[in-house]
């Protein structure tokens, strides 16, 4: 039976990657047989190739389950089922926590390397999907920005969407980040997590948990979430916790989305941070104007050369950093400057907050404070300091932590739309073709603004147009999107307004 062969291959994969030992083989085989309603077993002797990740085997097992009417043939049904399968190979939480602790006593990087690799091998991180994402770097005046087009989310068919609508509403787990997700079986509206494990942490004397993001937008993309389901809040404790984290994980950065709609992330209902082993473009950006805080002689400070408004603080002294960061946050919460359209409140609704990012530089602690404002008006209903409408063809979604640091996460539609445009650009009447096509018409104004810079279109292949023109311009557009989100603009008026705020919090130049 072919299904026995597939189970055998999956068991060999698990053995090769130390997910199980020989002593576990019979137990796991019987578990999988029960899951697949198999009443008999046929021994298979074959020299099969073991893949790096298990998805190819899992897809075939899911095909069998569909044929046998064990599951429906929907993307979510398959995800739920293959997660249940991999859950059979995933060690109990206590074992993973114990291994992580033992390794961290030798070296914290050994521990994170183990946990990240484990999260990929159990297919909690669906590596084969993530590898579909497009990625490139774009040179701008702010250095190389990083661009990714997100193609890893599979499309659901209409029947599945309809079934989801008819599902009864439940509140367990309360959200995608809650601790209750560990081992959860999943539903059509909430992902299965039998292969999900988390590591307990103490941050500033409070219980938090460390996990990896299943979507991995950058290397070792981690999520650090509170044990309690409570709303996102940026305050003094945020700075204490983030500095505590990088003290424990000096090879990682950590940052928080802002705590207000529009300028915040997609999950404001559960207090959490994101981190990882990646140096973002913003971290590479230099100080363009040094700032002195006389009350904090141990802190080196400055305004960062970045499209958004960023104050960088650096010190060996964590307490001083927390004090000044908190002072800056409290002042910014109440700060208005009519001349540049910054208002702290509309009636009693607050608009000002901060996106903080922390990292270690040798023995130094460094924290970037990105000033944010979520006000809207009639001309900008999605946000004044938000991607402007002329850039919505490329990016109209919120500018969250990852984008703030210089990595654009762009919608999957762009892959298809840009390829079409590249093909049309080979024709004389490309403007008409682009405007007549509902998929590409929205890009015409954007295209006309730069296309005359490029005189050799006819000699380039479609791939060359994509790589050397369209990808370059997408990167430049992303830098302008970040400028849109900056509260103090990069012109003289904006720069002076930023200096005025720095003076307001006790800084001088």
From Swiss-Prot:
Its EC number is 2.7.7.12. PROSITE patterns: GAL_P_UDP_TRANSF_II. GO terms for cellular component: cytoplasm. Pathway: Carbohydrate metabolism; galactose metabolism. One of its GO terms (molecular function) is UDP-glucose:hexose-1-phosphate uridylyltransferase activity. It catalyses: alpha-D-galactose 1-phosphate + UDP-alpha-D-glucose = alpha-D-glucose 1-phosphate + UDP-alpha-D-galactose. Keywords: Carbohydrate metabolism, Cytoplasm, Galactose metabolism, Nucleotidyltransferase, Transferase. Signal peptide: none annotated. HAMAP family: GalP_UDP_trans. Belongs to the galactose-1-phosphate uridylyltransferase type 2 family. This is Galactose-1-phosphate uridylyltransferase. It comes from Fusobacterium nucleatum subsp. nucleatum (strain ATCC 25586 / DSM 15643 / BCRC 10681 / CIP 101130 / JCM 8532 / KCTC 2640 / LMG 13131 / VPI 4355).
């Amino acid at each position: 039976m072919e299904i026995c062969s597939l189970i055998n291959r999956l068991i060999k994969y698990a053995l090769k990657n130390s997910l199980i030992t020989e002593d576990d083989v019979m137990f796991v085989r019987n578990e999988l047989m029960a899951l697949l309603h198999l009443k008999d077993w046929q021994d298979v002797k074959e020299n099969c190739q073991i893949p790096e990740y298990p998805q190819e085997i899992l897809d075939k097992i899911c095909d069998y389950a569909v044929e046998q009417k064990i599951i429906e043939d929907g993307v979510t049904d398959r995800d739920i089922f293959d997660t249940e399968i991999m859950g059979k190979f995933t060690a109990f939480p206590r074992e993973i926590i114990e291994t992580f602790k033992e390794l961290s006593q030798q070296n914290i990087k050994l521990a994170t390397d183990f946990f990240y690799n484990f999260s990929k091998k159990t297919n909690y991180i669906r590596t084969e999907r993530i590898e579909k994402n497009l990625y490139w770097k774009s040179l701008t005046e702010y250095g190389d920005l990083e661009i990714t087009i997100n193609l890893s989310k599979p499309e659901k068919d209409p029947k599945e969407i309809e079934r989801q609508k008819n599902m009864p509403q439940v509140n367990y787990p309360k959200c995608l980040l809650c601790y209750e997700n560990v081992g959860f079986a999943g539903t059509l509206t909430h992902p299965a997590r039998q292969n999900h494990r988390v590591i307990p942490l103490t941050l500033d004397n409070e219980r938090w948990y460390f996990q990896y993001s299943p979507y991995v937008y950058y290397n070792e993309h981690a999520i650090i979430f509170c044990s309690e389901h409570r709303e996102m809040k940026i305050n003094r404790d945020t700075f204490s916790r983030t500095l505590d984290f990088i003290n424990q994980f000096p090879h990682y950065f950590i940052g928080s989305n802002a705590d207000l709609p529009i300028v915040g992330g997609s999950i404001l209902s559960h207090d959490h941070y994101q981190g990882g082993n990646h140096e973002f473009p913003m971290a590479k950006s230099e100080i363009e104007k040094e700032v002195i805080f006389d009350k904090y002689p141990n802190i080196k400070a400055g305004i960062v050369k970045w499209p958004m408004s960023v104050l960088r603080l650096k010190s060996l002294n964590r307490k001083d950093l927390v004090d000044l960061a908190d002072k800056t946050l409290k002042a910014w919460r109440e700060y208005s400057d009519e001349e540049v359209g910054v208002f702290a409140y509309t009636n009693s609704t607050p608009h000002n907050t901060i996106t903080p990012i922390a990292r270690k530089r040798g023995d130094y602690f460094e924290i970037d404070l990105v000033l944010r404002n979520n006000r809207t008006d009639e001309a900008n209903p999605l946000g004044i300091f938000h991607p402007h409408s002329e850039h919505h063809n490329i990016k109209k979604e919120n500018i969250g932590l990852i984008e703030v640091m210089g990595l654009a996460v762009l919608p999957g539609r762009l892959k298809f739309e840009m390829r079409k445009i590249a093909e049309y650009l080979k024709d004389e009447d490309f403007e008409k073709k682009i405007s007549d096509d509902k998929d590409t018409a929205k890009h015409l104004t954007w295209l006309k603004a730069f296309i005359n810079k490029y005189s050799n279109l006819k000699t380039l292949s479609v791939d060359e147009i994509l790589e050397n023109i369209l990808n370059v311009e997408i990167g430049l557009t992303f830098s302008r999107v970040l400028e849109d989100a900056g509260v103090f603009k990069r012109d003289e008026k904006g720069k002076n307004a930023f200096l005025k705020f720095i003076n307001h919090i006790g800084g001088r130049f």
